[in-house]
């Protein structure tokens, strides 16, 4: 139940990691369910 986007256009699911392009900004931040994920950050709920 997480339809939030991981800044790179990929959809981020609970527990899944957001894959991003190498060119994208790499700001690793933890994101909660429903919040936006930064590039390369893990979504933990």
UniProtKB/Swiss-Prot annotation:
GO BP terms in the entry: response to copper ion; response to high light intensity
Tissues expressed in: Expressed in phloem and mesophyll cells of leaves, vascular tissues of cotyledons, sepals and petals. Expressed in anthers. Expressed in root endodermis and at lower levels in cortex of mature region of roots.
Alphabetic keyword roster: Metal-binding, Metal-thiolate cluster, Stress response
Single GO molecular function: copper ion binding
Domain of life of the organism encoding this protein: Eukaryota
Metal-binding recorded as keyword: yes
Regulation: induction: By light stress, drought and salt stress.
Role description: Metallothioneins have a high content of cysteine residues that bind various heavy metals. Functions as a metal chelator of copper (Cu) and zinc (Zn). Plays a role in Cu homeostasis in the roots under elevated Cu concentration. Functions cooperatively with the phytochelatin synthase PCS1 to protect plants from Cu and cadmium (Cd) toxicity. Plays a role in Cu homeostasis, specifically in the remobilization of Cu from senescing leaves. The mobilization of Cu from internal sources is important for seed development. Confers tolerance to Cd and plays a role in Cd and Zn homeostasis.
Annotated family: Belongs to the metallothionein superfamily. Type 15 family.
Protein name in UniProt: Metallothionein-like protein 1A
Species this protein is from: Arabidopsis thaliana (Mouse-ear cress)
Gene assigned in the entry: MT1A
């Amino acid at each position: 139940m997480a339809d939030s986007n991981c800044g790179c256009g990929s959809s981020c699911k609970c527990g899944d990691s957001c894959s991003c392009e190498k060119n994208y900004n790499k700001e690793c931040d933890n994101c909660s369910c429903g919040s936006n994920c930064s590039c390369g950050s893990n979504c933990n709920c």
